[in-house]
Swiss-Prot record:
The iodate reductase (Idr) complex is composed of a molybdopterin-dependent iodate reductase (IdrA and IdrB subunits) and two associated peroxidases (IdrP1 and IdrP2). Its EC number is 1.-.-.-. Belongs to the AOX family. This is Iodate reductase subunit IdrB. Its cofactor is [2Fe-2S] cluster. It is an enzyme of class 1 (oxidoreductase). Residues 1-46 form the signal peptide. The gene is idrB. PROSITE patterns: RIESKE, TAT.
Amino acid sequence: MTTHPIHLHHDDPAHGGERACMSRRSFLLAGGAMVTLASLPGTAVAALKALKADYPAVKIGKLSRLKTGEPLEFAYPYPDVNNILVKLGAEAGGGVGPQADVVAFNQQCTHMGGPLQGTYKAKHQALGPCPLHLTTFDLTRHGMVISGHATESLPQIVLEVRGDDIYAVGVQGLIYGYSSNRAGR
């Protein structure tokens, strides 16, 4: 088998006037270097730190005051991040309370950040459709997409019950517009 070196020149008539910008050997060496760099310990440590973000515990409501199908809005983990707390009346993924039916979700569509305020449908236990591209989310299944353009579930607010008080203690999923939920925009 004969091999031909590949040069940066684009004027070789034998190859239609175009040549690749890199030899196979150079490509394999560069690819191997990238894999090696990606596996360095510093990269893995940064990823683990992102998974262990510390969130403040914030009291957001009382179990005794929640009515089935009537959502309450609250801000968490930042003052400008709007969320919804709702008692669904049926067991839900990530739900708290005696029936595991109290859940909380961020109110920005994960597709393009469309506002979901006022779109809760108690009959279907869903949030949406988003006014931008009609994505709808199932609140009984960790906010997964029912229909529409979004490919990610809604960020779910992690809840804790202490007596009658409900606390937001974390966020499961990335809030739209943030590179990291605890690192800011």
